């Protein structure tokens, strides 16, 4: 069993979770961050990394991946510990200001406060419902792409009709031997520009598109070799492949959060807007996972919540009645924590 000790455990490494690291770091508090996904960024990284976001202050037009990169650059100063591809199963309140957070890998984090920044909950891929197909998972069947070189010079079949399926098909066709995109219809839930580009590449014979659904698979010597695709009119067609990428989207699930004895409102965690503390003292919730009257599910709202939560947590952990507001432009204490040096004379010159 792996054991870690920190001031605050943050559940969720999406944009709000990353900003929570920074805000707690400004207060001099250490963090361990747990996320069920294998990389930081939450939905921004997993679902729409190349899509533009227009409502982040001072970033009028930035890709989701760029927002995450900037947030990480800001948070990395405080050297957080990450536990990725780990799902929190249990939170035990040992005493008023002491918790043990346990993951499904039996990692234990001893901390003095917990922040739930889990977005819509833990994400898991929507899987291909075909008996016995799962035996090829992570060898020839993939629900996410982490190493594009694995597909170089291979015959790749991509299933799906959303942004991820279109974007990866367009990317893979540059290096794969062949790419065949399969979707149940010609109605896509993806950017029109991506759909148009896909059809353009099909006309240029650089990739293919086929309407239909997978009805069975073929294998030889324990290797996946092909799929049978059934069209709407019942016609079967067999396609050969080396690799299969299934991008049906991600399914958010609250999972164990439902069992943590927190007061809920329609699958969201109720919080006090003064501190963003939940119904359990010492456990906080920020971002899309929380609820209060007037709640808006916006990244910038989550940033505001993370800042206020950090002050409240610091007052609890440091046992102070009220933490003063220290400005990053002028506070020597904050400058020391940020690892920057500024003198009053330099700022006034």
Swiss-Prot record:
Top-level taxon of origin: Bacteria
Pfam families listed in its UniProt record: Pyr_redox_2 (PF07992)
Record's keyword annotation contains rRNA processing: no
Catalytic activity entry: 2 reduced [2Fe-2S]-[ferredoxin] + NADP(+) + H(+) = 2 oxidized [2Fe-2S]-[ferredoxin] + NADPH
Positions bound to FAD: 35, 43, 48, 88, 123, 288, 329
A GO term for molecular function: ferredoxin-NADP+ reductase activity
Cofactor(s) needed by this chain: FAD
Subunit structure and binding partners: Homodimer.
Designated name of the protein: Ferredoxin--NADP reductase
């Amino acid at each position: 069993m792996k054991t870690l000790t920190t001031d605050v455990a943050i559940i969720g490494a999406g944009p709000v979770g990353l900003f929570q690291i920074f805000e707690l770091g400004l207060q001099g508090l250490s963090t361990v961050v747990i996320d069920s996904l294998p990389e930081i960024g939450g939905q921004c990284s997993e679902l729409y990394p190349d899509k533009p976001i227009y409502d982040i202050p001072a970033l009028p037009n930035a890709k989701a991946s760029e927002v995450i990169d900037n947030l990480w650059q800001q948070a990395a100063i405080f050297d957080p510990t990450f536990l990725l591809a780990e799902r929190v199963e249990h939170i035990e309140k040992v005493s008023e200001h002491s918790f043990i957070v346990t993951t499904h890998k039996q990692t234990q984090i001893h901390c003095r406060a917990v922040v739930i920044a889990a977005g819509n909950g833990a994400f898991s891929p929507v899987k291909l419902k075909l008996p016995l197909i799962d035996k090829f998972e992570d060898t020839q069947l993939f629900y996410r792409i982490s190493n594009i070189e694995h597909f170089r010079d291979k015959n790749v079949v991509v299933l799906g009709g959303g942004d991820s399926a279109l974007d990866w098909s367009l990317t893979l066709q540059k290096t794969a031997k062949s790419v065949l995109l399969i979707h149940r219809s010609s109605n896509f839930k993806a950017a029109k520009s991506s759909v148009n580009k896909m059809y353009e590449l099909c006309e240029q014979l650089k990739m293919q598109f086929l309407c239909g659904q997978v009805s069975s698979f073929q294998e030889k010597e324990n290797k996946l070799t092909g799929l049978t695709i059934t069209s709407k009119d019942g016609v079967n067609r067999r396609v050969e492949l080396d690799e299969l990428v299934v991008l049906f989207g991600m399914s958010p699930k609250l999972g164990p959060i439902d069992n943590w004895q927190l007061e809920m409102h329609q699958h969201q965690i109720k919080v006090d807007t003064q501190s963003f503390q939940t119904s359990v003292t010492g456990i906080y919730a920020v971002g899309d996972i929380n609820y209060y009257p007037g709640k808006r599910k916006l990244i910038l709202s989550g940033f505001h919540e993370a800042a206020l939560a950090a002050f409240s947590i610091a007052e609890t952990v440091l046992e102070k009645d009220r933490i003063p507001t220290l400005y990053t432009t002028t506070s020597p204490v904050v400058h020391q924590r940020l690892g920057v040096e500024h003198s009053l004379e330099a700022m006034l010159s």
